[in-house]
Each structure stands twice: as C-alpha cells, then as structure tokens.
Amino acid sequence: FGNSGAEVNEAAVKLARRWGRRMRGGAHEVISFDGAFHGRTLAMMSASGKPGWDSLFAPMPQGFAKARYNDIGSVERAITADTVAVMIEWVQGEAGVNPADPGFVRELRALTTERRVLLIADEVQTGIGRCGHAFAYERFGIEPDLMTLAKGIGGGVPLAALLCKEPFNGFEPGDQGGTFGGNPLMAAVGLAVVETVCTAEFLASVRRRADQLARGLQAIVRDHGLVAERGAGLLRALVLPGDTAVQVVEAARELTPTGLLLNAPRPNLLRLMPALTIDEDDVEQALSLLRLALRAGQRAT
C-alpha cells in the first residue's frame, strides 16, 4: 500500500525491474505511451508522455521508452531485449480522456505474453467503479500482470495500492514501503469503499448513470455544434470546436445558485468525473448547467 498514484506506479516499475533482473537477464526498460500520465515523481514524469516533461526537471531518470497509443505496431517496434514491461492507462485522462481500443488491448496482451514482457495497468483514475466495472481491464476480457490503484480506492483519503500476480511478486521485506502506507485508518476507509462500490448492484447503477450522461452529452454535441463526446463509464469528455475550455470551466464555476465542477486538461476539451453515487436527477441538473456554461463560455470569447 501507498499514499498516492505516483508512489505505487513507481513501485510497479521497481517490481517489474526486480522481476526482469531475476527472470529476464537484467531487462529493465519500461514502454509507456505518448500522452500518458503516471505521476509527478521524477521517474513517473519520465514514464509519462506529457509534452515538456522530459526537460522540465532535467536530467531525468532513464529506462523509459515511448510508443503510440492504440498502435500495436508502434509497441512491437519499441520492444527490445531490455524491455521488461509495458505500462498503460485504459483511458488516458490527462491526454483528453482517450479510451484504449478493445482490439488494441487484446493485441497488446497477446504481444506482451508472447515476448515475456509484463503488462502494468495504471488504474489510478479508471479503477474502483469509475468505468462501470470494479476495474477497467474487465471491459476488455484480459488481465494485466501488475495493477495500480489510488484516487477512488481511498474515497477521499490518501490511499493507493499495487497489486500483482504471484509469479511476479519479487519484493523482499524492505524493498518497498512508506511511513503511512496502508495505515489502519486509511485501510479501514479503503475496505469500506471496496465493499460498497465493488458490488453488482452498485456497479450496475454506475453503468446506468454513465449511459444517461453519455446520451445527454451526445445531445449537447448536436445542439451546440461541438466536435465529439467520448469516454468510459463516468469518466467522460466533450471536445470543443475551439480553445474555449478554460472559459467554460470558469463560467460553470460561477453559475448561481449552484456551480458545476469541470476540468480542462486540454484547451479544447472538458473532462467530467461525477461522483459514482450521482443519481438520475443530478445527472439531468448537471447537463442543464453544462448547457448554460457552454453558452456563457462562448459569450466570454
């Protein structure tokens, strides 16, 4: 256990490299993807594919290669004898809520298995019900070798976790840990979250609200002349025709008597991540407020 997504993502890389040293003759390089976001530690900034991060705090840790998202040929070309793992988000949140193509994911799982390369799933943003399943990998009918969780698993408190299949568990006592990781208070919260969210009834409700939200966003795209709506479960985005996302976010925050929290990871994109407990009426209210914010944002430009 850890406290943040970056912490457990870095632990996943450590574990993969430990396995590579023991089982793959010292293989250590990790392939990640253009547009990826894995955290703000130096190593995870190297693993991320966010523009400019390779020089912001240079020199950066080495041992990370990049491939193109949803391009299996790019991954295949990036694999070398030194490759120990591929690290992927099933939905790239910071890059603009870009979901992985199911066919690509299945090909990636087959390729990594064939080449004896570990598949690390960064489910910090997508896990614990966010995409309508306990874990987003369930949408693809595959399983990763290592998986990281944070954000949702803590229900608002700092809790994160690294999970792995037993054959890849090469950590020895003292290899990984932290002062507050897995402390009793946070663990109790995490257990309550998992026992509540990871039930068939709760997840079915998430999928119903996700379908409702997606339909509403598609109507907004048509009515407001936007570019597209996309996402998975209750992690969704609106693509705008111009770089007006910041203005829309500000307009949404200032709506009265109730504001609307939006996020703009890209100048032309709005990200929506409502609470998993959102009900039908709240979805409709949010969609109505979003329409108002879009009009106000357009007027501001």
Model-predicted regions and their roles:
Residues 1-301:
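Conserved N-terminal phosphate-binding loop of PLP-dependent enzymes in the Aspartate aminotransferase
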